[in-house]
A protein has these predicted regions:
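Short, surface-exposed acidic
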Residues: 170-173, 273-284, 329-337
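Conserved C-terminal helix/tail region of periplasmic/extracytoplasmic solute-binding proteins
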Residues: 316-347
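Solvent-exposed, polar/charged alpha-helical surfaces in well-ordered, non-transmembrane soluble domains
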Residues: 62, 66, 85, 89, ...
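Sec/Tat-exported extracytoplasmic proteins
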Residues: 67-68, 91, 96-99, 107, ...
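Secondary-structure end/capping motifs
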Residues: 238-326
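Short, glycine-/small- and polar/acidic-enriched structural segments
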Residues: 33-169, 174-177, 193
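Short, low-complexity disordered leader/linker segments with a strong preference
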Residues: 1-42, 347
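Pocket-lining segment of extracytoplasmic ligand-binding domains
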Residues: 101, 176, 181-272
């Protein structure tokens, strides 16, 4: 899941985010070519620092290199919208840690993406935080206030959902588009009075004069906040063994957390730049999905034929409807999100 988004046509084109598409860091690791990666060329994998979650274990422990071999390049992005240009260009065949709105924005512009791994559902690690000094007592109280978020990220959907339920017209709210690091700074300087954000910034705000007004546990499962991993459909269909190895590497991170929890907390804390205590709190705020969970009705569906009725596909549709109503995207909601969800690489 990331920090503030303006609700009016913030991601009407992928090109709008070109200015923030530069990755923060690139890690290149060469490994012996595996059967999966032969003829696939150099493989780029994008990811975000979402705090403590199993995918950061896969990055830190080099599971992608172990499973995929060959030349794997890891690119760190500040947010999902920041990765859109790379995804749209086809230069980034895999991306992890995305919220649904950036994926929807890309798909709406014709980028051939499929969700191939649903990492986790947010329950307590993302939401709406207000300053205790702001006087904001309810979602309706955001009227006339400055709210920070990452435009085009999951935060847009969350805020739109909270506002709709509270009867709040978002045109009455001053929305400030910031990256997660900028949001943290804006909070400290008093530029914003509230924010919709995810970990690790979410925890920072709560512990620095903030109060949780709403969290993602208030969202229904069919319209909830997930961290998801996507693959370029064209690339994955040409190199299915690579896609399966990508999913396997993500599963390795989940298994490490399940089997070596104490060590895993240390790995996640170091990789995310947080304390072990914070990592422990953050990981408790997720419902985490393993590889075996993927091909189930609640996650990606049992097959391509049933993916449209899966929890992930239904949440994609509900996110899409909310973003369309809010004017964040201009492409109408499709009848089915089944074509954008693929459980087969997890089998």
């Amino acid at each position: 899941m990331h920090v503030i988004r303006r609700m009016t046509r913030v991601v009407s084109t992928v090109a709008m985010v070109a200015g923030i598409a530069t990755p923060m860091a690139v890690e290149a690791v060469r490994a012996t070519p595996s059967a999966a990666s032969v003829n696939a060329g150099s493989i780029a994998i994008g990811y975000e620092n979402n705090g403590a979650d199993p995918s950061i274990i896969s990055v830190a422990n080099k599971y992608f290199q172990r499973e995929m071999g060959h030349d794997v390049r890891l690119k760190l992005f500040t947010s999902g919208p920041a990765a859109l240009t790379s995804l749209a260009s086809g230069q980034l065949p895999f991306m992890c840690g995305l919220g649904m709105p950036p994926v929807i924005a890309a798909i709406a512009q014709g980028v051939p993406l499929q969700v191939v791994f649903n990492q986790e559902r947010y329950t307590k690690d993302a939401g709406l935080v207000v300053k205790t000094s702001s006087g904001i007592k309810s979602v309706a109280g955001l009227a006339g206030k400055s709210v920070g978020l990452v435009i085009g990220s999951q935060s847009s959907f969350e805020l739109a959902t909270y506002a709709r339920k509270a009867g709040l017209n978002l045109s009455s709210v001053r929305l400030v588009n910031l990256t997660p690091p900028e949001l943290q700074s804006a909070w400290a300087t008093g530029r914003i009075e509230a924010a919709v954000v995810w970990d690790p910034v979410y925890d920072f705000l709560v512990t620095h004069g903030g109060r949780v007004l709403m969290d993602d546990s208030k969202l229904p499962v069919t319209a909830t906040s997930f961290n998801i991993c996507v693959a370029n459909k064209s690339f994955a269909s040409k190199h299915p063994a690579v896609a399966r190895a990508f999913v396997k590497a993500l599963g390795d991170g989940v298994s490490y957390l399940q089997n070596h929890r104490t060590a895993a907390l240390g790995v996640m804390a170091k990789a995310a730049g947080i304390s072990v205590a914070t990592a422990k709190v953050e990981i408790a705020g997720y419902q985490i999905y393993s590889v075996s969970d993927q091909a189930t009705a609640a996650v990606l569906g049992t097959s391509s034929a049933t993916s449209a009725t899966s929890g992930t596909a239904q949440s994609l549709l509900n996110n899409w409807r909310a973003l369309y109503r809010a004017g964040t995207i201009t492409t109408r909601t499709p009848k089915s999100a089944g074509p954008f969800v693929n459980p087969n690489y997890a089998k």
